[in-house]
Amino acid sequence: MTTSSTKTTAQAHGRYIRGSASKVRRVLDQIRGRTYRDALIMLEFMPYRSTEPITKVLRSAVANAENNLGLDPSSLMISTATADMGPPMKRYRPRAQGRAFAIKKQTCHISISVSATQSTNSEDSD
């Protein structure tokens, strides 16, 4: 075990986000592996409702990397981005003759990790 390794990964979580995990995953699949700046540009122009909480969690992860680890935001890359199912919010809709139908509004948990990119100049060595 080496104890001299520096930590270069910061993470943030968004809990109980209103929206289904599958709809959040389709956005996370497109930004995973991209740089912070590219991901923000992509999220700004995507036509999905889930981009707002994802942007909020991504900015929180970058702020954690900047404040806690002293990393430069321009050198950060999204290493992991996951959306897990949360507990459903149970609501009831009144129906005819005194009945009630259950409505389950889906929630999800968003987790994003950002890490520093290794900027090596291997292209210059011809």
From Swiss-Prot:
Signal peptide: none annotated. InterPro entries: Ribosomal_uL22, Ribosomal_uL22_bac/chlpt-type, Ribosomal_uL22_bac/org-type, Ribosomal_uL22_CS, Ribosomal_uL22_sf. One of its GO terms (cellular component) is cytosolic large ribosomal subunit. GO terms for biological process: translation. CDD domains: Ribosomal_L22 (cd00336). Keywords: Ribonucleoprotein, Ribosomal protein, RNA-binding, rRNA-binding. GO terms for molecular function: rRNA binding; structural constituent of ribosome. Pfam families: Ribosomal_L22. The keyword Ribonucleoprotein applies. Belongs to the universal ribosomal protein uL22 family. This protein binds specifically to 23S rRNA; its binding is stimulated by other ribosomal proteins, e.g. L4, L17, and L20. It is important during the early stages of 50S assembly. It makes multiple contacts with different domains of the 23S rRNA in the assembled 50S subunit and ribosome. The globular domain of the protein is located near the polypeptide exit tunnel on the outside of the subunit, while an extended beta-hairpin is found that lines the wall of the exit tunnel in the center of the 70S ribosome. Part of the 50S ribosomal subunit. This is Large ribosomal subunit protein uL22.
